Curated annotation (Swiss-Prot):
Pfam families referenced in this protein's UniProt entry, alphabetically: 3HCDH, 3HCDH_N, ECH_1
Molecular function via GO: 3-hydroxybutyryl-CoA epimerase activity; enoyl-CoA hydratase activity; long-chain-3-hydroxyacyl-CoA dehydrogenase activity; NAD+ binding
Region: 3-hydroxyacyl-CoA dehydrogenase, residue numbers: 308-705
Keywords: Cytoplasm, Fatty acid metabolism, Isomerase, Lipid degradation, Lipid metabolism, Lyase, Multifunctional enzyme, NAD, Oxidoreductase
Protein function: Catalyzes the formation of a hydroxyacyl-CoA by addition of water on enoyl-CoA. Also exhibits 3-hydroxyacyl-CoA epimerase and 3-hydroxyacyl-CoA dehydrogenase activities.
EC number: 4.2.1.17, 5.1.2.3, 1.1.1.35
Provenance organism: Vibrio vulnificus (strain CMCP6)
Subunit note: Heterotetramer of two alpha chains (FadJ) and two beta chains (FadI).
Catalytic activity, as annotated: a (3S)-3-hydroxyacyl-CoA = a (2E)-enoyl-CoA + H2O; a 4-saturated-(3S)-3-hydroxyacyl-CoA = a (3E)-enoyl-CoA + H2O; a (3S)-3-hydroxyacyl-CoA + NAD(+) = a 3-oxoacyl-CoA + NADH + H(+); (3S)-3-hydroxybutanoyl-CoA = (3R)-3-hydroxybutanoyl-CoA
A GO CC term attached to the entry: cytoplasm
Protein's name according to its UniProt entry: Fatty acid oxidation complex subunit alpha
GO biological process annotation, one example: fatty acid beta-oxidation
Amino acid sequence: MSEQKAFNLKIDEQNIAWLGIDVPNEKMNTLQAAFADEMKAIFAQLKDSSGLKGLIVHSLKPDNFVAGADVRMLEACKTAPEAEALARQGQELFQQLSDLPYPVVAAIHGPCLGGGLELALACDFRVCSDDDATRLGLPEVQLGLLPGSGGTQRLPRLIGLLPSLDLILTGKQLRANKAKKLGVVDACVPQTILLDVAKQFVEKGKKRAKQKVTTKEKLLSGSGLGRKFVFEQAAKKTHEKTRGNYPATVAILQVIQHGLEKGMKQGLELEAKRFGELVMSNESKALRSIFFATTEMKKETGSEAKPSKVGMVGVLGGGLMGAGISHVSVAKAKVPVRIKDVSNDGVLNALKYNYKLFDKQRKRRILSKAQLQSKMLQLSGGTDFTSFNRTDVVIEAVFEDLSLKQQMVADIEANAKPETIFATNTSSLPIHKIAEKAQRPENIVGLHYFSPVEKMPLVEVIPHESTSEETIATVVALAKKQGKTPIVVKDQAGFYVNRILAPYMNESAHILLANEPIDKIDTALLDFGFPVGPITLLDEVGVDIGAKIMPILVAELGARFKGPDVFDVLLNDGRKGRKSGKGFYTYKGKKKEVDKSVYKLLKLTPESKLSDNDIALRCVLPMLNEAVRCLDDGIIRSPRDGDIGAIFGIGFPPFLGGPFRYMDQFGLKELVEKMNQFAEKYGDRFAPCDGLLTRAGEGRRFYDN
């Protein structure tokens, strides 16, 4: 029996060659170094085949073109030159495709990403299906890399400098219509006629003519002055976003500029060289570890049991969280939702929230008007329990009040099916207490979403001792369908994310009370890599929420969670944060500025004494300490879950790989030394926990690799 091949060549009666891509035993097509010889042989055959009219490159998979290069092959590279050689191999193969003497057309349906798009860019023409599954992009920057098989050189020459910089620096994915508008593809057609249209391009019998350069493009990339201006502005904007923490963005700008100034050949040489260097960088290794972790987690069910089918979801509470949960249930999980609130205004609020989000998609032409109406018809609500007897999962998002949540359990047990799962979106109350009076405690589980629900990718699944395996499996499956990454955590105060966040927030308050300026503290943590500073975060979450959560953590977990007394002072002055228009900052529309009257209120005289690095480490070290305790207490199942939880839940810097990868990179012995220094200087709250001391003493790490 002949060995299965990834690339299958056929020549039809009209002398058109068809190259079908079908990676054996894989759901998605990816490009792998192992295919190089196979591709070389096919391209040599195609070059020597006289009389061919053209070549159509397409996928034999039903729902994807090429999802990119197989990232796993980078893990085998031990040096930068090894990784550089991989890039050169890809460049040479795609150049052979580009050099074929007749028209080459890529027929694209489904994801066409990374190396897949680079392959398509090496063709003369690209035709794609108008299907929602079709996405085109170069997402390498999200792995701390740059496109290494010609993408940095071909894309700017095809669609111009500015749109190329936008795509390559962000890694954003284009829908089919947008790709056509930008000129990435030449035609966007229904999938049923995709191959016929590709054939028409071949039958025209012409290779692609040299791209006509617009006057604007001549000014921007054709002149030294224009290029200098564009790249200076791009570097400035990129640095504002990345704060210098992502070397890939610097390399991308350098490589594209070099290619435009020195020509494509030299551009490709530098592209391969920088690609090799980036593969070996700590930032890319950390970002790739996140990619592998999330890929693994997609396959996990969180439980031994099989999930039950969820045909309808109930949501209790029409506030911000309830509205967001109802949205991801309809938009992503595609299940109808019934919302219950104590008032019609609450229900209306949730429906309006959903309409606003769907209408935004309509304006961006992601949804048609009919699709928007269809989505809204999946949502209904009222002030009673009508239709709750048809729900399979009810997600409760009411106020953080134990007796109210227990009442919700009783109401659902009285008004829903016996097997209906009750998932509580509490952020601080123990699940076992919410389930205390339940008739069917096995159906009760925590499902902790983060705000805004439609944007934040994490959800914590919190079973209590009596939660059934089937309940866990069902809510994990539902969370995935809602577009979330679920981590299963133990039922203890703060769960995982809030428990590691609390000491971080407390320390920022200690630093503030030592007279460090508010904006200095926030800037230090932004530079460290967090998306927002801790003081801003407290304003966003709400000072009143912080005031509720901290005492629960102190009562359950001990005095180390006791922070400085700032909450009451602020709340007595009407400062709840953004929602009340003032907290540590004042808010006018989208603008915010430090409210200097806070210093007077807290009897402070702001004066910067600490370095940015010391401020950042003072906030981060207690978080790391608590993350280790969570692992050793069984709150999280693995360092991997802890890293994903911190990155997706609170924005721990992705380029550091999460708390546990960062500790490994820092070195546990060095970390213990630093904590001891801080403990001497600032107090026992910095003393390294037993788990950290033991591992450091034994020379262990959290990860083997």
